From Swiss-Prot:
Catalytic residues, chain numbering: E50, D67
Keyword Cell division: no
Subunit structure, as described in the record: Monomer.
Lineage of origin: Eukaryota, Metazoa, Chordata, Craniata, Vertebrata
GO cellular component: extracellular region
Protein name: Lysozyme C
Signal peptide: 1-15
């Protein structure tokens, strides 16, 4: 039990939590501003509400699936966690979404929004970002 607690603390300690403007710059540099018509502010809002910009965020859902990483990408549809029956549409292991190298997560998020639901696939975006004034998400970032 003590070993498990230590391992969990190490995993949390190694999490990368981005500062809002730093994250916005990274997203812009990865071509997310305007990708599929989605503004940078929408991406920043989405990830604020999904993970608070935390690369190691996970959330277990009532259907047995898990959401992974800074975008909270779901194991039922987008990645393989070897526990959930999956479509694995991003063709990745879910653990790849929990690393500090967010390029895989960004590529998968781009794949998600190519589906008919677009950015609406994320409940947090629908509840907190859709139709809102999102200017505060880029305020002070110089973007």
């Amino acid at each position: 039990m003590r070993t498990l607690v230590v391992l969990l603390l190490v995993a949390v300690a190694n999490a990368r939590v981005y500062e809002r403007c730093e994250w916005a710059r990274l997203l812009r540099n990865q071509g997310m501003d305007g990708y599929r018509g989605i503004s940078l502010a929408n991406w920043v809002c989405l990830t604020e509400w999904e993970s608070h910009y935390n690369t190691r965020a996970t959330n277990h859902n009532t259907d047995g699936s898990t959401d992974y990483g800074i975008f909270q990408i779901n194991s039922r549809w987008w990645c393989n966690d070897s526990q959930t029956p999956t479509s694995n549409a991003c063709n990745i292991r879910c653990s790849e979404l929990l690393t500090d190298d967010v390029i895989v997560a960004i590529k998968c998020a781009k794949r998600v929004v190519r589906d008919p639901n677009g950015i609406g696939a994320w409940v947090a975006w629908r509840q907190h970002c859709q139709g809102q004034d999102l200017s505060s998400y880029l305020a002070g970032c110089g973007l």
